[in-house]
Amino acid sequence: MSWIDKIFSKKPSSDSRRANVPEGVWTKCTACEQVLYRDELKRHLEVCPKCGHHMRIDARERLEYLLDKDSMTEIAADLEPKDILKFKDLKKYKDRLSAAQKDTGEKDALVAMSGTLYGMPIVAAASNFAFMGGSMGSVVGAKFVQAAEEAIEKNCPFVCFSASGGARMQEALLSLMQMAKTSAVLAKMKEKGVPFISVLTDPTLGGVSASFAMLGDLNIAEPKALIGFAGPRVIEQTVREKLPEGFQRAEFLLEHGAIDMIIQRSEMREKLASILSKLMNKPSPFLEPEIIAD
């Protein structure tokens, strides 16, 4: 073999082949560990096409899927958290906020928008778990209240998707206040006869589950969502007992009457539209026009 043949017959190393694959093209399902093409997963709304596992989804992406295109107006987009208490644990709170804002591109853990769903006016909000575990602080509470007030003003339904570890400990009492604040505005909505639909996604825990997340006129969950106050590991360590299989999962809660229904993410938009049209006494967007014979 000549020296030219030797050069051109060399196979590229596995390292060089890996280097040619752009970062972020592939990901792994957190349930079945199947390697998935990122774009395919995005087309399936972050639901594994192999096992059906519902992964966590960005708040803005969720609202863009729910609401009609070109109908969205963000609510309280200018609100930004402040480190009033100068709180510090392993890191300063202001540094945690800066890091979360840089990583997510959001100012805080809740995004709220007004828009339409199949032409029907609604207000919708969604938690971003990637922002400090979706924890509820002053800004999350304020955004939720402003969204609810807008729903009351427009006499249109309010839908909120929760994904949170609970109250934000770095805001101490200011965070706990939001439980009462959000519950109070929902009482006002109930008094005015404006529907509130709570959609609990994985995970919904702590002060969020103990306040607005479980106060819906209808409480809906995504499949296998973890829902509760304390997490299962904390409960097991406290009571020193093994918990039942599937304890605190959406299916367990549905079986025991704690939630009203479970809806697949791919069906959420259509089913919410159907439910809300009934609650608002409006024609369903999916009814076929009646044909009257001559």
Curated annotation (Swiss-Prot):
GO terms for biological process: fatty acid biosynthetic process; malonyl-CoA biosynthetic process. It catalyses: N(6)-carboxybiotinyl-L-lysyl-[protein] + acetyl-CoA = N(6)-biotinyl-L-lysyl-[protein] + malonyl-CoA. Residues 25-294 form the CoA carboxyltransferase N-terminal domain. GO terms for cellular component: acetate CoA-transferase complex. PROSITE patterns: COA_CT_NTER. Component of the acetyl coenzyme A carboxylase (ACC) complex. Biotin carboxylase (BC) catalyzes the carboxylation of biotin on its carrier protein (BCCP) and then the CO(2) group is transferred by the transcarboxylase to acetyl-CoA to form malonyl-CoA. The gene is accD. It holds the Pfam family Carboxyl_trans. Binds 1 zinc ion per subunit. PANTHER family: ACETYL-COENZYME A CARBOXYLASE CARBOXYL TRANSFERASE SUBUNIT BETA, CHLOROPLASTIC (PTHR42995:SF5). It comes from the Bacteria. Acetyl-CoA carboxylase is a heterohexamer composed of biotin carboxyl carrier protein (AccB), biotin carboxylase (AccC) and two subunits each of ACCase subunit alpha (AccA) and ACCase subunit beta (AccD). This is Acetyl-coenzyme A carboxylase carboxyl transferase subunit beta. It is found in: Cytoplasm.
